[in-house]
Amino acid sequence: MSAEGYQYRALYDYKKEREEDIDLHLGDILTVNKGSLVALGFSDGQEARPEEIGWLNGYNETTGERGDFPGTYVEYIGRKKISPPTPKPRPPRPLPVAPGSSKTEADVEQQALTLPDLAEQLAPPDIAPPLLIKLVEAIEKKGLECSTLYRTQSSSNLAELRQLLDCDTASVDLEMIDVHVLADAFKRYLLDLPNPVIPAAVYSEMISLAQEVQSSEEYIQLLKKLIRSPSIPHQYWLTLQYLLKHFFKLSQTSSKNLLNARVLSEIFSPMLFRFSAASSDNTENLIKVIEILISTEWNERQPAPALPPKPPKPTTVANNGMNNNMSLQDAEWYWGDISREEVNEKLRDTADGTFLVRDASTKMHGDYTLTLRKGGNNKLIKIFHRDGKYGFSDPLTFNSVVELINHYRNESLAQYNPKLDVKLLYPVSKYQQDQVVKEDNIEAVGKKLHEYNTQFQEKSREYDRLYEEYTRTSQEIQMKRTAIEAFNETIKIFEEQCQTQERYSKEYIEKFKREGNEKEIQRIMHNYDKLKSRISEIIDSRRRLEEDLKKQAAEYREIDKRMNSIKPDLIQLRKTRDQYLMWLTQKGVRQKKLNEWLGNENTEDQYSLVEDDEDLPHHDEKTWNVGSSNRNKAENLLRGKRDGTFLVRESSKQGCYACSVVVDGEVKHCVINKTATGYGFAEPYNLYSSLKELVLHYQHTSLVQHNDSLNVTLAYPVYAQQRR
């Protein structure tokens, strides 16, 4: 059975420093089991940022080693099903010529390819095929400043070049061979590979980028991403990297060898792409791809970044005068189960050293996330919990989250990560929030609620409209790309017909000239002209469609930008509206009045509440408070009940309660926090003085504002129907 995992590619060489580490070589492919990251408390999406994870434990597919490696030394490739390896089929191998038979150069040209696939030529720690490395080193040593390099053909024939390539890499001496022969052997090597260095699978995407993206900077970034994609096997990627470094080195001395990026791309793009496999109409676009790859310095290796720290275990935790025995729930900087968006809002425009702690998004018991402001950005640091100890990384040494935070309020986090040279200076206090509601009377607050709700609805409608346009445009772009491919095939068919007709027309025209049959000659010429005209029409239609596609692709990106710019406003408006609504609810404003300010007429809306009813069964706590019942008993009590049926029980989490409610026919559970400010499902909503007050509020207010999967109200106490 296969398991899910993630693949990474090594960007730098790393020599292991500890027994549990593994060596890395540039281009190595590594696999990490998803379960190992989940066990450490990382959520979906974080695997794409290995530098934030720190040290990963995985398997080096290139060397066969298993162990720890630094996340700062690798890049994320994508997901992968991990299963037992299957033997890779060998490429076709040519039959040897029978002894005594003679072969001409033409015979050699027709011979099947002699070189093995790139995947079979590389073995760690090679950064490219050994034969290719030897050729390039010899060429750079002899001909780096040669003005005729790669442009003058040597006197060697094809058979001699292939004989050179067939030699044993270790024994062959290239010192005495002319540089032009080496250059021709280099070209022949690229042509004799079973598959081009740049696989045909990425041709169409490269061409689409060249046609659709107008910004050169954006084009380079997208091209980099495509070149590093899993579509290019890592042996091919390493070879391409090596070739680009060679071409870049040649272009650096173009004043002497006359080989600038453009000239090199014109010479080698047919060999790297194999134009016979691509449309000749796209030749210029493919040349442009190679020119950009050579011209930009993205392929040059940067110095390796700092290793993620493995801090030594502290001998003792200094007593800093703070209360390490304080409950986490009472800590002003602990916000419980709030979203990342809310955290970003609270830390917006704050000073370096501002911080807060929330529950980890993985919901694993005991794991938390510290969000710290550093360098104008939010840094997310996982707080791990194992065997009663807490910490940022192994070994875990602190007895509580409070003790951990207090330690780093006096000590720099550079102990943990050299890039985080800052202390936890300014806690974002849940007790000293900015007063959002500035007005001092109910009527004024109600008017502001109406204003914010109107703005929120307008923004929501705008976002929905953009989303529909985004989806429609995406579908149209795909249809146009398909149509362009169909045009290309149609043009190819018509051109073949045109060539066939042209070939046979010459014979018939000569025949009819001898016979003096002018009418038949005119008919043949007329048919030929009609065919050429039809080809021109199709080419014009394709050109217009390509122009439309380019414009629509630009619109598509603009829509995406606008949607992303609206999201923060939408979140902030909803948050502000909810705070005004909560203020009014706490002041005892009746629901009918709230509905007027919210403009609600549909009673099914989450804010359109039923009329206040003094006879609600919710007033009797015995109808819903079941005391110390556990999760299984709660599910048995609620099984088969209608949506909105609920109960409240004591939670396994010390000092808290749990609410169990039926949603879409299933029983869901959520924690009710008990804090110094009151009961609630999450900050800043822990404001209800009793469980009864909380239940009465959510009798008419949906839980969806706290959890998207809980679109339900606490409508029916579990024992209410039995008591009627």
Curated annotation (Swiss-Prot):
Positions where N-acetylserine occurs in the chain: 2
Site (Arginine finger): 151
Gene Ontology biological process: cellular response to insulin stimulus; insulin receptor signaling pathway; intracellular glucose homeostasis; negative regulation of apoptotic process; phosphatidylinositol phosphate biosynthetic process; positive regulation of endoplasmic reticulum unfolded protein response; positive regulation of protein import into nucleus; positive regulation of RNA splicing
Pfam families (UniProt xref): PI3K_P85_iSH2, RhoGAP, SH2
Entry comment on modification after translation: Polyubiquitinated in T-cells by CBLB; which does not promote proteasomal degradation but impairs association with CD28 and CD3Z upon T-cell activation.
Segments of this protein annotated with the region Disordered: 80-109
GO annotations of cellular component type: cytoplasm; cytosol; nucleus; phosphatidylinositol 3-kinase complex
Domain (Rho-GAP): residue spans on this chain: 113-301
Keywords noted in UniProt: Acetylation, GTPase activation, Phosphoprotein, Protein transport, Repeat, SH2 domain, SH3 domain, Stress response, Transport, Ubl conjugation
Biased composition (Pro residues): 84-97
Magnesium as UniProt keyword: no
Chain positions found as Phosphotyrosine: 467, 580
Domain named SH3: residues: 3-79
GO molecular function, one term: 1-phosphatidylinositol-3-kinase regulator activity
SH2 domain residues: 333-428, 624-718
Sequence positions bearing Phosphoserine: 154, 279, 608
Family per similarity comment: Belongs to the PI3K p85 subunit family.
Written domain comment of the UniProt record: The SH3 domain mediates the binding to CBLB.
Task performed by this protein: Binds to activated (phosphorylated) protein-Tyr kinases, through its SH2 domain, and acts as an adapter, mediating the association of the p110 catalytic unit to the plasma membrane. Necessary for the insulin-stimulated increase in glucose uptake and glycogen synthesis in insulin-sensitive tissues. Plays an important role in signaling in response to FGFR1, FGFR2, FGFR3, FGFR4, KITLG/SCF, KIT, PDGFRA and PDGFRB. Likewise, plays a role in ITGB2 signaling.
Subunit text: Heterodimer of a regulatory subunit PIK3R1 and a p110 catalytic subunit (PIK3CA, PIK3CB or PIK3CD). Interacts (via SH2 domains) with CCDC88A/GIV (tyrosine-phosphorylated form); the interaction enables recruitment of PIK3R1 to the EGFR receptor, enhancing PI3K activity and cell migration. Interacts with phosphorylated LAT, LAX1, TRAT1 and LIME1 upon TCR and/or BCR activation. Interacts with CBLB. The SH2 domains interact with the YTHM motif of phosphorylated INSR in vitro. Also interacts with tyrosine-phosphorylated IGF1R in vitro. Interacts with CD28 and CD3Z upon T-cell activation.
Protein name: Phosphatidylinositol 3-kinase regulatory subunit alpha
